[in-house]
Regions:
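Generic secondary-structure transition motif, activating predominantly at the C-termini of alpha-helices
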Residues: 23, 27-30, 52, 56, ...
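Short, solvent-exposed recognition patches
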Residues: 34-138
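Generic detector of leucine side chains in alpha-helical contexts
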Residues: 19, 26-29, 48-51, 97-102, ...
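Low-complexity, Pro/Thr/Ser/Glu-rich flexible segments characteristic
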Residues: 1-40
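A short, solvent-exposed beta-edge/loop patch
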Residues: 8, 15, 83, 115-184
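Stable alpha-helical elements in mature extracytoplasmic
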Residues: 11, 15-18, 22, 44, ...
Length: 184
């Protein structure tokens, strides 16, 4: 009976810790982590497209983009790279500091999430010096690496037909995060 009580107590402590981390994430959202972040107009997707790198050995296709100002403002730029059967799509999204757009990411990063299955994993991590997360599915050879820059921009590399997430880390590593953070 005591063992069962301890295990219930331990489960309660873990649940309380999870709720505390969840509340911390919501607090960061409400105040933009500093309390002084207010939504701004997203940058032009053309400005973000200019930051997509050329990568040796990969064919870079024509970038695309879109921007919307209502009901939720955001801007997104994309480009696809191919090498044989492998494909990598880079995306850059400007949330305009709209914390509702960033809620899933902020909570994921705050919680220090990690999950592993027989086919792969998901985890929060550092990506090119930025808070980020990584997913890998070994059965399909698909992966994703994301970085949150300046509490505003999300930089993503999604790969299909690749060997592991190292190549995705390399692609994101070629993005100048200082220039991304300075976009206005």
């Amino acid at each position: 009976v005591a063992a069962a009580g301890q295990s219930t107590e331990e489960a309660g402590k873990q649940a309380a810790k999870g709720l505390e981390q969840f509340a911390k994430g919501l607090g960061m959202l409400a105040g933009g982590a500093t309390g002084d972040s207010k939504p701004v107009d997203p940058v032009s997707f053309h400005d973000m497209q200019a930051l997509f790198p050329n990568v040796d050995g990969w064919e870079k296709h024509k970038p695309t983009g879109e921007r919307m100002s209502s009901p939720v403002s955001y801007s997104e730029a994309q480009v696809e790279y191919t090498k044989g059967d492998a494909r990598i799509e880079m995306k850059m999204v400007d949330s305009g500091l709209n914390q509702l757009l960033l809620m899933p990411y902020t909570m994921f990063l705050t919680a220090g999430y990690e999950k592993e299955t027989s086919d792969g994993y998901e985890k929060s991590t550092k990506v090119n010096g930025q808070p980020g997360w990584e997913k890998w599915d070994s059965s399909s050879k698909n992966g994703e690496v994301n970085a949150l820059v300046n509490k505003r921009f999300v930089v993503t590399a999604e790969g299909r037909g690749i060997d592991d997430t190292k190549i995705l880390q390399e692609f994101v590593g070629k993005i100048d995060m200082v220039k991304v953070a300075a976009l206005k």
